[in-house]
């Protein structure tokens, strides 16, 4: 591993420190700091570790026993399977007993650090360093673990087996060789052992890595409970759970130090990391990407990506053997200059986006997909693609085509098109103004459908954004809110890698402006139309909408009820707010650092020495800058926008004129003078002021209005006394949570003049208070704040505002409120609780005007906690929690309360006060009545209503504490964010002062939100987070995020219900006890992204002190009565309580405003229209994407009751409860000669029969492992008679739509073979015996009413009269003979009957078999039936005896079928099939069935592992056989193992099992925005298809119309595609067709290539829509483990194939001659050896080959001519088609009749072609007895099973 820097800080989440420390300095500081400083669990574990047991000092024994020196042995598994053997008898004097924890330490020399604390401390920097080093630098594996704490080996004492003790009495202690290698032990070496306390060796965090499997978080929870909890673990330990789930312990942390072993205590936090994840790499191609490197290398910044960072990342993936799937997307935002192009911009107004720039620059976002889901191991190919796309990216996004018709300009006027050449009109924006949030949102969008098409090999999704910027981005409030909420409900990791040097402020930083509300006539462009601020004006957003108020002017002034809202909005748009998101981890790529690391690994003599500080020769290196470049602006840094001017120096800050507020120039001049005289002007500098205080003032100079000269001292004293009473009670709690730095005299914590409160950026406690409480400075003002309403709610004109009555935008402190939590008027605060999804609602709030302002009486400590005393205010402003989403107050909005006279307001000047911590408010403070009157929060752009005397009297009666709590403990737990914006943005972004942020605040664990428990130690920003980039962490199982009790009572809606186990489960796999039910309910929530809430805070809030010490890995403690457990996810909290009576009470807490506000915003901001270019797309295309941040509401009541066994109320639980769903198909392949070698007994079978035999084998497996509840199992064991296969899959050679149209009544309604036994059982008294039955009587019984079903059956184009199926006769014999107990006995008896001449095979080729074989009664035993040849039904339906499947396209396409639309949509007149079932009532039919399948037959799990298996009832062997799996709470790894075993079984019979998407290919863009089908059109339209050949009277379809897609299907057959699924329009309109998993909704028929790698749909217009099946690659990766399930020598197959030229030795899939030969892909025999890169390229090769053929006019004409001259069945699959190569016959014959030599397999690049010779005819088939062959119909039948190529 390379040297990464002085500190190894590879963690998932990262927030930067305020400045960049020197690397060595930071390393030393880390080494010298106390191990528990900043640790996340000091409160929980601190009592377990005495101060003398420092993690960095030598641990001295705390026991009274002496340390014992013993001889250690090393043994292997042949000696014992136990990892450590300990002979207690040898240590009887120590009193060691089973269960004690023993440590093993190597004996070292006296000079070693073991005996020298001083030397150990001296080597601390080296031994305790977190720097990862490579093997060349530190060859000793123990080099990182030198201290005793790190290198000791721990184990739990177990009794020594007696046989070992007897054979080796001198054995003291022995370890396995694997353990010895980890700890560096040698055999027979001396070691020290000692007894240690479990608390001293308890691990705080454990990193657990896994790969090549999909694990849900519930399985992780169960794995920890089963394999790790309360056990000793060691680094490198292999974990096997249920014999299938495999993981490895990577790192163990004790007090922030890596150790080799530790004890997994109840409070240990497991961190699971996936080494087979899906990575989405976004590369921001902003303007700086083409800038030259400022470090002097001369390369452009993109070279850092392509030559530096990405190769390093891929190499680390390869070194760690990670198997990720990589998607790379280039994205940028292009700004267009309309004036430069001299023509109207050819972009419609819907596709343009106006950013906040002064000139309304139109922009468009571009995305270029480079690779999609490509294996990370082929990184060289990835880099090649990236280089190719980089060459043309700038040209493509900058070029604007000007030939669009009726192109609207920016003002909406359409202009006639001008045929003008493409113009370079665009220019990429800077990284600062890029579309990073939209890109992240797009990448996370598909996670909303993560339960569908589940990848069974990869776990986790991580997004890496590579930007040339420095980590600062200007974003809109809506984008930040929407993206943050989308990430809040999805456990996804996001890493930001910056190519520019790290700035001197906190990063990553998002700049956003106030969500100004626009009028109804304004456009979206006007919404963000104000110019960018040239410099940073406001550094804080903790009081983000509080106007900056000068101290002098703040003392005066009055509250007025009216302000100029339009000017307010304009001024607010200039206010910048800054926030650091919790969900983003930032890294800085410095190529020099890793260049030096590589030199160290290569043992370069000039390389720097590790762990040393290299003094820099120069402190500053000047750089040469080009004047032209500087003038272009490309060299400007984002830091120029982060300057911190004092308010007096704001000459460059321009706002709207202030005349609207009645401010005269003289007033402004007096304001300046008063400001100069203000003693507080320096402490109140803008850099430390909590955000804009005077949004109502249009000029920054307005903030300098004098106000506080005459403030009475009595009022100031009262305010101080009031604050002391309000805030003091929480001082104790504050000090318990985190110590505070002493206040600096020169920088007091709070400097408030009137309405303004100043915070010290140096004070961690005060900073966090104000970050949490946006406008906590609002308290001292007794003003009533009216909720702001929507624009349309008030239409009265606004009252003019005199200069003396301008209201302040934000009061500094808020009066206490007893009835309602305060509504802080901070428009947006990315505070500790983070991001929700909503823009601010239109609410009114207090405003302050500092010009001649006078304070209102401060007698009221309440800020509108309940209903307004003035009913006019209530009537006008009352509203629900879901208010309008308008973000700007309309100018028509005016206060409902009448304007009060100056006499009604008492002047109440104030002085600066200190904010104390408020006491916790009792729950009775929250009054339900408040909710109906006051919306959830207050906005900043609002109107203040001053109090009159009545108001003051009313307020005096409410003197309880403040409405929300400001606490010092950071995080979201004790602080409420009451403005709608705060609630919308909590808990995912935190507002800070980016230029002066306390290190303690940054390293507080509350910064990391839901990811808090993923950090073993505080992260650092100066290095690349390789741990996160190499193996992303899965969302931790636990969290400490929890709201306060008041928030829980006032801001959340509670929905309680109870769940109890179903006493009558009707055979379902349901929990039998409450404890099992509770575990399943917790598991279900964990798998849906919930986290278990632990810690002190939730215990205090809930009053359940047991939660503080809750052991989440021991469910026994959770099952007792009264036990409570909380789980949280985003804004949703669930409380599960075990109550009396065996029930579980569930209470759902849902945030009041999140859903309503989110719903409002979705209507206005969810549509996103970027230009996107997918992999094969020739150009960029606009896409309209709905960025919906809110997840669909999940019905937890239904889900819990479903788990409990109450399932009658759900008609489709898989969709209603969002089951995990995957779909598979079995594709018929051509049989390899070696496959036949394993099927010696079936050599006479053709391919089709072998394929059916494979499906039959699968159905036997399914039946054998069908889930049977224990009660039914006991009943079956007593009645062990006759196992019959109930699946009854019916086979036919036509498509399901034809079957439904022709024989609906007989086959699907009247035929009992689908849902019941095919024959009626004889009474018990009439059961037969083999020994007492005669042949003639048996013949009569079989052909009787209670016998076997006899009917005319068609197979391909042959009609077999009066025959039965072997499967049905086997079942009949089993049920009607007393002495036949198994199907094998029935088959043997059937062969005896066949030998005696009772019946015979219709082709006389087979003996009697249990399967889909046709047999006829011999002529001497045949009974004539009145329906001559009609079977049981009238003659018109007599030919329909065999079912078909939904995946066939055989008879439907053939000339013999009159159904025009078989596997494609009809182009002719409407089709009206002669369906016998035609009736007034619409018939319904189910084409699939569902069964419960047990994926854990060996009972490795501690619960039932059952899935729903949906399978086809009708199947055409020429096409795919479908089955779908769905499950709710089953272990996915067991499902994967089951599917792999099925694949191995099917492979033996020439069937390829492939996972395919559930939805059709054309709908892929709905769930995966970076994918799109590739359209291919025919250059020459095909001629009209041939008239289909009709059958005689036995035909089951009437003459149909010409199939307009005849040639299209023939072309698909030529390129080796088979039908997957039919379009829903192919079925008769009068029949309701459905499947057990739902109704068919395919718009177009879908086909799949035999390799499984490509899907294609045929549109109504005759175009082809191609899509790569990326799911097949995951199955290929899984099949590498196939030898576990199939003991088959694949190497032997490869060798045999090379030397054999068997006619049937054809590789699969066969691509067409146009496609580059890709022989091995898809072949079952060589599946494990397929190169995944070739598999990734296979779809592209197939598609390009197909497109080349379709664009070649000559070949198309030749193809049409030959296909029309010799019409064949258009069923997809090489059927009776002629070939281009005459050496390849078009008809695949059985092995027994094919004798001529075929070309060598590698030369076969196409399985089937339409050119070539006429196919051969099997002579044996011609001689079939009792069969009719129709002349003129192509021969197929049993000749051609399923032409597998």
Swiss-Prot record:
PROSITE patterns tied to this protein: DEP
GO CC aspect terms: GATOR1 complex; vacuolar membrane
Domain of life: Eukaryota
Biased composition regions of type Basic residues, renumbered to the chain: 1-12, 732-743
Chain residue ranges for the region called Disordered: 1-48, 547-566, 732-822, 854-982, 1425-1483, 1825-1845
InterPro entries named among the record's database cross-references: DEP_dom, DEPDC5_CTD, IML1, IML1_N, WH-like_DNA-bd_sf, WH_DNA-bd_sf
Transmembrane keyword on record: no
Keywords from the UniProt entry: Membrane, Vacuole
Pfam name, any one: IML1_N_fung
Topological category with respect to the lipid bilayer: Peripheral membrane protein
Domain DEP: residue ranges: 1344-1419
Lineage of source species: Eukaryota, Fungi, Dikarya, Ascomycota, Pezizomycotina
Organism of derivation: Aspergillus clavatus (strain ATCC 1007 / CBS 513.65 / DSM 816 / NCTC 3887 / NRRL 1 / QM 1276 / 107)
Gene3D superfamilies associated with the record: Winged helix-like DNA-binding domain superfamily/Winged helix DNA-binding domain
Locations listed in the record: Vacuole membrane
Bias type Basic and acidic residues, positions: 34-47, 755-772
Polar residues bias: start-end ranges: 24-33, 969-982
Single GO MF descriptor: GTPase activator activity
Protein name according to UniProt: Vacuolar membrane-associated protein iml1
Ligase as UniProt keyword: no
Biased composition regions of type Low complexity, renumbered to the chain: 801-822, 874-886
GO biological process: intracellular signal transduction; negative regulation of TORC1 signaling; positive regulation of autophagy
Record family assignment: Belongs to the IML1 family.
């Amino acid at each position: 591993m390379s040297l990464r820097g002085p500190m190894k800080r590879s963690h998932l989440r990262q927030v930067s420190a305020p400045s960049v420390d020197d690397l060595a300095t930071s390393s030393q500081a880390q080494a010298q700091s106390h191990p528990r400083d900043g640790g996340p669990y000091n409160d929980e574990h601190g009592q377990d570790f005495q101060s003398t047991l420092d993690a960095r000092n030598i641990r001295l024994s705390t026991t009274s026993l002496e340390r014992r020196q013993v001889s250690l042995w090393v043994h292997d598994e042949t000696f014992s399977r136990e990892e450590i053997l300990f002979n207690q008898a040898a240590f009887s004097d120590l009193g060691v007993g089973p269960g004690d924890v023993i440590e093993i330490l190597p004996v070292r020399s006296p000079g070693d650090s073991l005996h020298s604390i001083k030397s150990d401390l001296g080597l601390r920097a080296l031994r305790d360093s977190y720097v990862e080093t490579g093997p060349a630098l530190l060859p000793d594996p123990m080099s990182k673990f030198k201290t005793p704490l790190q290198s000791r080996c721990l184990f739990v004492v177990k009794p020594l087996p007696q046989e070992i003790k007897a054979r080796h009495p001198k054995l003291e202690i022995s370890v396995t060789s694997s353990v010895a290698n980890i700890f560096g032990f040698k055999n027979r070496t001396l070691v020290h052992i000692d007894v240690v306390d479990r608390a001293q060796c308890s691990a705080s965090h454990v990193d657990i890595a896994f790969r090549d499997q999909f694990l849900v978080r519930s399985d992780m929870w169960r794995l920890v409970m089963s394999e790790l909890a309360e056990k000793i673990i060691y680094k490198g330990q292999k974990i096997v759970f249920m014999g299938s789930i495999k993981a490895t312990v990577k790192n163990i942390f004790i007090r922030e130090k890596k150790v080799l072993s530790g004890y997994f205590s109840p409070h240990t936090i497991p961190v699971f990391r996936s080494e087979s994840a899906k990575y989405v790499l976004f590369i921001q191609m902003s303007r700086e990407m083409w800038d030259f490197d400022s470090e002097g290398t001369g390369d452009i910044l993109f070279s850092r990506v392509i030559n530096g960072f990405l190769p390093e990342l891929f190499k680390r993936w390869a070194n760690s053997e990670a198997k990720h799937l990589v998607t790379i997307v280039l994205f940028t935002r292009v700004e267009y200059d309309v004036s430069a192009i001299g023509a109207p911009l050819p972009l419609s107004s819907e596709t343009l986006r106006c950013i906040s720039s002064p000139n309304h620059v139109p922009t468009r976002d571009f995305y270029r997909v480079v690779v999609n889901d490509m294996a990370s191991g082929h990184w060289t190919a990835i880099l090649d693609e990236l280089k190719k796309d980089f060459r043309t990216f700038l040209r493509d996004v900058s070029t604007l085509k000007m030939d669009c018709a009726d192109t609207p300009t920016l003002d909406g006027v359409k202009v006639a098109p001008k045929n003008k050449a493409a113009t370079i009109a665009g220019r990429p924006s800077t990284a600062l103004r890029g579309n990073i949030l939209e890109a992240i949102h797009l990448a996370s969008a598909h996670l909303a459908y993560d339960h569908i098409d589940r990848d069974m090999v990869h776990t986790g999704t991580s997004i890496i954004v590579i930007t040339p910027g420095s980590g600062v981005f200007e974003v809109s409030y809506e984008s930040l809110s929407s993206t943050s909420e989308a990430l809040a409900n999805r456990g996804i990791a996001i890493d930001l890698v910056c190519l520019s040097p790290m700035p001197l402020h906190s990063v990553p930083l998002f700049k956003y402006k106030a969500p100004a509300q626009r009028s109804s006539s304004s456009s979206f462009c006007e919404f963000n139309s104000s110019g960018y601020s040239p410099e940073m004006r406001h550094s804080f957003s903790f009081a983000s909408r509080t106007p900056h108020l000068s101290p002098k002017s703040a003392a005066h002034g009055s509250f007025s009820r009216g302000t100029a809202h339009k000017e307010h909005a304009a001024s607010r748009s200039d206010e910048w707010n800054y926030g650091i998101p919790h969900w983003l981890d930032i890294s800085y790529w410095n190529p020099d650092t890793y260049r030096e690391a590589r030199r160290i690994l290569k043992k370069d003599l000039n390389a720097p020495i590790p762990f040393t500080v290299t003094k820099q020769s120069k402190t500053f290196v000047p750089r040469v800058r080009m004047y032209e470049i500087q003038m272009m602006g490309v060299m400007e840094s984002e830091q120029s926008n982060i300057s911190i001017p004092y308010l007096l120096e704001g000459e460059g800050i321009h706002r709207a004129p202030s005349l609207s507020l009645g401010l005269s120039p003289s007033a402004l001049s007096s304001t300046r003078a008063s400001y100069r005289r203000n003693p507080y002007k320096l402490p109140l500098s803008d850099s430390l002021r909590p955000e804009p205080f005077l949004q109502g003032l249009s000029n920054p100079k307005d903030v300098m209005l004098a106000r506080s000269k005459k403030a009475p001292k009595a009022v100031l004293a009262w305010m101080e006394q009031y604050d002391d009473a309000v805030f003091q009670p929480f001082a104790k709690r504050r000090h318990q949570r985190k110590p505070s730095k002493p206040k600096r005299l020169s920088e007091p914590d709070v400097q408030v003049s009137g309405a303004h409160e100043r915070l010290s950026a140096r004070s961690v406690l005060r900073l966090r208070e104000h970050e949490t409480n946006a406008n906590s400075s609002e308290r001292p003002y007794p003003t009533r704040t009216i909720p702001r309403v929507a624009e349309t709610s008030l239409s009265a004109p606004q009252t003019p505002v005199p200069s003396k009555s301008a209201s302040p935008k934000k009061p500094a402190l808020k009066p206490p409120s007893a009835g309602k939590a305060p509504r802080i008027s901070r428009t947006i605060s990315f505070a500790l609780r983070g991001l929700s999804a909503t823009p601010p609602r239109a609410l009114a709030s207090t405003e302050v005007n500092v010009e001649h302002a006078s304070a209102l009486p401060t007698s009221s400590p309440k800020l509108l906690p309940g209903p307004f005393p003035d009913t006019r205010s209530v009537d006008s402003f009352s509203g629900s929690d879901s208010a309008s989403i308008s973000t700007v107050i309309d100018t028509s909005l005016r206060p409902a309360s009448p304007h009060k006279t100056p006499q009604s307001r008492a002047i109440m000047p104030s002085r600066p006060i200190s904010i104390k911590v408020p006491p916790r408010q009792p729950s009775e403070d929250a009054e339900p009545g408040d909710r109906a009157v006051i919306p959830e929060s207050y906005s900043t752009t609002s109107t203040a209503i001053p109090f009159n005397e009545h108001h003051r009297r009313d307020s005096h009666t409410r003197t309880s504490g403040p409405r929300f709590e400001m606490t010092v403990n950071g995080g979201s737990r004790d602080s409420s964010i009451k403005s709608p914006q705060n609630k919308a943005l909590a808990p995912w972004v935190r507002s800070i002062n980016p230029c002066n942020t306390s290190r303690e605040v940054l390293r507080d664990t509350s910064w990391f939100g839901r990811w808090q428990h993923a950090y073993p130690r505080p992260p650092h920003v100066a290095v690349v987070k390789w741990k996160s980039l190499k193996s992303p962490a899965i969302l931790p199982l636990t969290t400490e995020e929890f709201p306060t009790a008041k928030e829980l009572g006032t801001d959340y809606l509670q929905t309680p219900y109870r769940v109890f186990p179903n006493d009558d489960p009707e055979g379902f796999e349901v929990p039998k006890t409450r404890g099992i039910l509770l575990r399943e309910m917790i598991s279900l929530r964990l798998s849906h992204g919930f986290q278990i809430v632990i810690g002190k805070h939730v215990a205090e809030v809930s009053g359940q002190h047991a939660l503080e010490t809750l052991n989440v890995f021991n469910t026994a403690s959770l099952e007792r009565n009264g036990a409570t457990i909380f789980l949280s996810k985003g804004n949703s909290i669930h409380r599960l309580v075990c109550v009396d009576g065996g029930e579980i009470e569930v209470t759902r807490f849902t945030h009041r405003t999140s859903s309503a506000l989110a719903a409002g915003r979705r209507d206005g901001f969810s549509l996103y229209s970027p230009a996107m270019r997918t992999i094969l797309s020739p150009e960029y295309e606009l896409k309209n994407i709905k960025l919906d941040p809110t997840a669909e509401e999940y019905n937890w009541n239904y889900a819990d009751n479903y788990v409990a066994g109450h399932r009658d109320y759900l008609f489709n639980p898989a969709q209603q409860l969002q089951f995990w769903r995957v779909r598979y198909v079995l594709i018929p392949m051509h049989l390899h000669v070696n496959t036949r070698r394993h099927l010696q007994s079936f050599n006479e079978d053709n391919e089709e029969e072998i394929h059916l035999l494979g499906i039959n084998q699968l159905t036997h497996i399914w039946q054998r492992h069908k889930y049977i509840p224990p009660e039914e199992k006991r009943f079956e064991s007593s009645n062990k008679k006759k196992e019959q296969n109930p699946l009854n899959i019916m086979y036919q050679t036509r498509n399901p739509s034809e079957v439904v149209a022709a024989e609906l009544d007989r086959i699907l309604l009247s035929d009992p073979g689908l849902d019941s036994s095919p024959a009626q059982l004889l009474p018990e008294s009439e059961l037969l015996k083999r020994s007492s039955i005669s042949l003639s009587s048996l013949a009569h019984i079989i052909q009787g009413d209670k016998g076997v079903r006899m009917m005319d059956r068609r197979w391909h184009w042959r009609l077999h009269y009066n025959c039965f199926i072997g499967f049905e006769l086997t079942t009949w014999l089993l049920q009607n003979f007393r002495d036949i107990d198994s199907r094998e006995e029935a088959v043997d008896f059937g062969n005896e009957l066949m030998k005696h001449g009772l019946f015979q095979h219709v082709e006389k080729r087979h003996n009697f078999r249990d399967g889909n074989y046709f047999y006829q009664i011999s002529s001497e035993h045949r009974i004539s039936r009145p329906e001559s040849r009609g079977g049981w039904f009238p003659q018109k339906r007599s030919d329909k005896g065999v079912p078909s499947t939904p995946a066939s396209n055989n008879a439907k396409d053939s000339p013999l079928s009159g159904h025009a639309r078989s596997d494609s949509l009809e182009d002719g007149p409407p089709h009206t099939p002669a369906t016998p079932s035609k009736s007034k009532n619409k018939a319904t039919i189910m084409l699939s069935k569902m069964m419960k399948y047990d994926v854990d037959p060996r009972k490795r799990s501690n619960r039932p592992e059952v899935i729903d298996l949906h399978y086809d009832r009708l199947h055409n062997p020429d096409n795919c056989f479908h089955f779908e799996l769905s499950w709710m709470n089953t272990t996915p790894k067991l499902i994967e193992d089951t599917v792999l075993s099925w694949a191995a079984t099917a492979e033996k019979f020439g069937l390829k099992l492939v996972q395919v998407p559930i939805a059709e290919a054309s709908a892929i863009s709905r769930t995966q925005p970076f994918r799109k089908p590739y359209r291919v059109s025919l250059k020459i339209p095909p001629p009209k298809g041939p008239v289909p050949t009709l059958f005689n009277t036995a035909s089951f379809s009437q003459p149909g119309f010409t199939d307009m897609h005849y040639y299209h299907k023939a072309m698909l057959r030529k390129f080796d595609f088979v039908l997957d699924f039919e379009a829903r329009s192919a079925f008769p309109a009068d029949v309701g067709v459905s499947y057990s998993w739902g109704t068919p909704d395919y718009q177009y028929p879908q086909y799949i290539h035999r390799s499984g790698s490509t899907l294609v749909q045929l549109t109504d217009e005759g175009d082809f829509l191609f899509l790569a099946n990326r799911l097949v690659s995951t199955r290929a990766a899984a099949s590498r483990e196939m030898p576990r399930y199939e003991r088959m020598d694949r190497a032997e197959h490869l060798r045999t194939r090379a030397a054999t030229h068997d006619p049937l030795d054809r590789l699969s899939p066969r691509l067409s001659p146009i496609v580059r030969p890709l022989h091995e892909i898809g072949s079952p025999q060589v599946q494990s050896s397929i190169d995944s890169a070739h598999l990734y390229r296979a779809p592209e090769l197939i598609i390009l080959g197909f497109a080349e053929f379709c664009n070649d006019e000559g070949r198309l004409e030749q193809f049409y001519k030959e296909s029309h001259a010799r019409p064949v069945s258009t069923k997809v699959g090489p059927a009776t088609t002629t070939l281009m190569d005459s050496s390849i016959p078009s008809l695949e014959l059985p092995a027994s009749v094919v004798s001529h030599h075929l070309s060598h397999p590698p030369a076969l690049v196409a399985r089937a072609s339409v050119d070539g010779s006429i196919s051969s005819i099997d002579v044996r088939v011609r001689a079939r007895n009792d069969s009719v062959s129709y002349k003129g119909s192509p021969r197929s039948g049993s000749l051609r099973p399923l032409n597998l190529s």
